[in-house]
């Protein structure tokens, strides 16, 4: 769970000003505003972006409570919000008539009605009238008896529905929620059901509404269109809450009458109150108007409370995983849970289990198909996910379709392969906040391997590093996407810390110039764990830079006691490797940098040495020339003093090469310093020799 940010009054004022000026969502359109706001408030970009998302959700909640449309969405028709919310903490005596003590479900949805024309007849005994698309609006009428639950569907067009689908689940609840991120003309199936506690069967009707989540309460048997059912008070289950004036519409989903069977159903939240048997004399409280005033994903009506609870639920997902097994028997699908024993058919208490199918493609129809759910796989198409939860914790159940059991999309008739990982349902089901992703916990050796490949040029997510990414993924036995995620996180870490990302290198990894990997294998666990103190950011990719700075500041505090213990033990000549902190990878990187610098300095020194040698050689040559000239001048002076003409002629005929090249005809009257010094020195030497 990420750290909570505490803003000052000035920061709150700046954030609110930017929000009022258009910084209302987290899309690319508001990127520049979020960036400017982050610079002005001196906050991290991700912190401001998170604040925008929280602010947007709170405003949506307030608007939903007041009956207004959610801000920030562009719809052709005004939004109408359906709010069906249960307080988990509410005692059983205060629960509404459609809830039970141990079966609390948060049901929300935002529906955009299409244009409706002629209004048709209503049912006098119904609480809700479900009508066909573009024909009849939904209308909530007064009823004589609140305990009667009737659903009526006038048939104007062939509508996809399901029949003869019985559910043998005495203690199960259904939530089928759907969200679409792109508003289009697609419809989803909206099933409202009423549970019959006498024979564990439920009759329901079917309605399709556009755009947003489809919700189905209770294990249900979908009956053909046009049939009315009435239930006695002793079989009273959930009451359907709809706002007056809502006009969700029905659309022809291009299919024939087929069987839609929901074989296994679960609920999300659990309360600690004991179960109570709903009978004919069970106290039932009619739904109050308060239930219609709460908004999306709200249990208490307090946005601050709900955000705290949402984070608390998100933090629970990694603590106690629960496992579910599914198997198929006959025409129904039963569920067995390791933590729950299925009751006998005589018990009618709903368990707290849930299957949440969201993001299904438009007009997803199950046509005459049975689904075999096998353990340890997860189900989601490109835009659909199935969740299972027990004791509101994340479950590792794994539904998987057999080869012939596939989702049939009625519009394009495409089959989707089912695969993928689960996300957290209480985050993704009802919130626009980004889902918490599965985190990969690398071992110390895996991190050393990844950073070894990073140092070898695996620093890009593009195709240039594809071979290295595949090689390290094979070596670590992980998916390539996990390696790419690690690379992206490390690149972001480098950018935040102001470090230039090394350029990528193509081709396979070459470790010939790097230390042998065997040296890493010889390290003790104490040595190996050393470098990971400062590597928290590699694993915590969603934590802001403040946390990474904190972790780097904590690192010296952990090193000091180790060094102190090491110095104490050095006095006793008993130093253990566990108390020595060795930065293996960082030292290797620093060594590589220092080696390159040393090579540059060495090459520069070699050049200077060659230059010095050349100068020394030149100096030696000049010395030899000087001695020759000195000898010649000495001999010539002696010949001139002795007035020996023959000796003078012999010396002049055999001049040194340097003197032969000189032009004596244009000789300067004033001798240069060198010749003067040489001649004076020669005369001095001659006088001394004499």
UniProtKB/Swiss-Prot annotation:
One of the GO BP terms on file: regulation of transcription by RNA polymerase II
Compositionally biased intervals (Low complexity): 64-76
Gene Ontology MF annotations: DNA-binding transcription factor activity, RNA polymerase II-specific; RNA polymerase II cis-regulatory region sequence-specific DNA binding
Residues making up the signal peptide according to the UniProt record: none
Swiss-Prot/TrEMBL keywords: DNA-binding, Homeobox, Isopeptide bond, Nucleus, Repeat, Ubl conjugation
Covalent link location (Glycyl lysine isopeptide (Lys-Gly) (interchain with G-Cter in SUMO2)): 135, 140, 144, 163, 172, 194, 212, 221, 232, 613
Domain of life, per lineage: Eukaryota
Annotated GO CC locations: chromatin; nucleus
Chain spans, region Disordered: 55-76, 112-132, 501-539, 664-690
SMART domains per the UniProt record, alphabetical: HOX
Biased composition (Polar residues): 113-123, 674-690
Subcellular location: Nucleus
Protein name: Highly divergent homeobox
Organism: Homo sapiens
Protein encoded by which gene: HDX
